[in-house]
Amino acid sequence: MLRGRSLSVTSLGGLPQWEVEELPVEELLLFEVAWEVTNKVGGIYTVIQTKAKTTADEWGENYFLIGPYFEHNMKTQVEQCEPVNDAVRRAVDAMNKHGCQVHFGRWLIEGSPYVVLFDIGYSAWNLDRWKGDLWEACSVGIPYHDREANDMLIFGSLTAWFLKEVTDHADGKYVVAQFHEWQAGIGLILSRARKLPIATIFTTHATLLGRYLCAANIDFYNHLDKFNIDKEAGERQIYHRYCMERASVHCAHVFTTVSEITAIEAEHMLKRKPDVVTPNGLNVKKFSAVHEFQNLHAMYKARIQDFVRGHFYGHLDFDLEKTLFLFIAGRYEFSNKGADIFLESLSRLNFLLRMHKSDITVMVFFIMPAKTNNFNVETLKGQAVRKQLWDVAHSVKEKFGKKLYDALLRGEIPDLNDILDRDDLTIMKRAIFSTQRQSLPPVTTHNMIDDSTDPILSTIRRIGLFNNRTDRVKVILHPEFLSSTSPLLPMDYEEFVRGCHLGVFPSYYEPWGYTPAECTVMGIPSVTTNLSGFGCFMQEHVADPTAYGIYIVDRRFRSPDDSCNQLTKFLYGFCKQSRRQRIIQRNRTERLSDLLDWRYLGRYYQHARHLTLSRAFPDKFHVELTSPPTTEGFKYPRPSSVPPSPSGSQASSPQSSDVEDEVEDERYDEEEEAERDRLNIKSPFSLSHVPHGKKKLHGEYKN
């Protein structure tokens, strides 16, 4: 008899309140299949890596990840071990005996899940035979020249083979397999074609054709129902990939997407409405001290300021304490990531700040990897000059301090001319002379290979943001991922984000958007759009996102020019906030991190697993979903105090007066508001299982 206990699952929106018997994981095996298991390529790696702990806590030794084998990743990320589960051990042994190379171990991340990794190159001799199998299964042919698709065919064929071996030795256990993206979809197609007794889930994080069409500057969302899908895929030479993706979607027992906006897209592009929307989460780590993340912001901001001192040597005519650090990061997709609208908004922001004679300087970083051949010599020289000046200042300070100390011991007020001798003055004059330069600070930190056609640099030339002294907006393109070993900006991405004031991600195509979510978890305000999954999620579940530091640009129902004006308004309003207002806003932003915790969002994956088991094994698992209650779902409430946002409590000048701060002291109590927010979010959610009590059922599972 299956054991179970009740689990209270409450909707963040869309999913009704429902109480079910917990799945008997002792009698189940869960496999998640993705090309990015131990293999960092894009955002799916983050999804799987961060979700692993929550899933491993729930499923224990019966949870396995399947991915490709790469020697470097295996050495650095995986600890090899022998499979404990008998069915998995037999499957691995059987495949190795038949000429495959299957590696098994624990992934060295939180949760330490088991991983099964297939060596693609070792099994490439089967490629032609497996192409025939795929053609017989779904009449999809793969061109010889498409190396990536051929690799996916090998990976999918090995996955289906492995799952067959597992089910042959499962000894009555039921198998659930979740496949992420089209790269893993061939394994699903072949498993279903061979009628393997497994419950399948297919999750799309973005549609193939959607990404291609949006990159071509097409008005995608207003023409979703007008595209000739086959024609568009054929013109872009991805028809076979599109067919694999669509076949995977229609073969799966349950189809899921990561956001509502992607669900709409998938319904039109792939011709199936998703059964469940599974938002992406993060592992949220709370600090023991309430304001520790504020201290980290100050510490890492100082390190960014050091870089700016070197990069802008000879042109440091602005106050670093009145400088705001903004950034955009991600793949180099100029239009999809919104770099085009961001640059245009920066041009307009520069005009506004100059027109109002603001003393605020905005420093904008573009962290987008592109093709480079080396560091920019001027940038390297700037950091060398900065370090030289620091050494000179430190040397003079030591001598100055010793002479001052001796004079005070003698009871004398020293003459500065006596303390600073001629050698010191000469050294300082040489140091000052070394900071002089005729050229402007470089816009990019590296030498770009195609700088004449680079979209970001071409736009910068058009709008004229060349880091002139008169510009209030300065731009720095860092065409490389951040690293703590870099000689220019030795910081990891997380450290850099914590040191910035605002992340700007005005994406046109963003199925979820981990970058603004990561900002939120770290207490950094961000700009997103209503075309990103994250933006739609926050718009749905937070009554006043702007008050909590989530600025949502309307890119769906406004023209590009209107969207650009709205973004400019957000940026200008942010520049007008006082330091205190920004601190209050960061506190509120960090409190939203509970909404993005996998402990909450993991329930959507639980629901998908229940659903697929009920469809694959209706005699064993059954679910009767009744109509959800008539409710609009939970909304994180607006702060009780006046929100320190451009729309609600911005100062009329770049800096607020002391009197204004005193007034804010009276109406804002950080601890009281934080406690109210904690109660608000915990009342509709439950982090732990609810062992007792029966509620009105909105879904019931029977054995």
Curated annotation (Swiss-Prot):
TM region(s), chain numbering: none
Tissue-specific expression: Specifically expressed in liver (at protein level).
Disordered, as annotated region: 628-703
Summary of temperature dependence: Optimum temperature is 30-40 degrees Celsius.
GO cellular component: cell cortex; cortical actin cytoskeleton; cytoplasm; cytoskeleton; cytosol
Keyword Phosphoprotein in record: yes
Post-translational modifications reported in the UniProt record: Primed phosphorylation at Ser-657 (site 5) by CSNK2A1 and CSNK2A2 is required for inhibitory phosphorylation at Ser-641 (site 3a), Ser-645 (site 3b), Ser-649 (site 3c) and Ser-653 (site 4) by GSK3A an GSK3B. Dephosphorylation at Ser-641 and Ser-645 by PP1 activates the enzyme. Phosphorylation at Ser-8 is not required for interaction with GYG1. Interaction with GYG1 does not regulate the phosphorylation at Ser-8 and Ser-641.
Amino acids binding UDP: 40, 331, 515
Any GO BP: glycogen biosynthetic process
Phenotype for residue 479 to Q: In GSD0; loss of glycogen (starch) synthase activity
Phosphoserine modifications at: 8, 11, 627, 641, 645, 649, 653, 657, 683
Segments of skewed composition (Low complexity): 647-657
EC number: 2.4.1.11
Class of this enzyme: transferase
Binding positions (UDP-alpha-D-glucose): 205, 211, 331, 510, 512-513
Clinical note on disease: Glycogen storage disease 0: A metabolic disorder characterized by fasting hypoglycemia presenting in infancy or early childhood, high blood ketones and low alanine and lactate concentrations. Although feeding relieves symptoms, it often results in postprandial hyperglycemia and hyperlactatemia.
Name of the protein in question: Glycogen [starch] synthase, liver
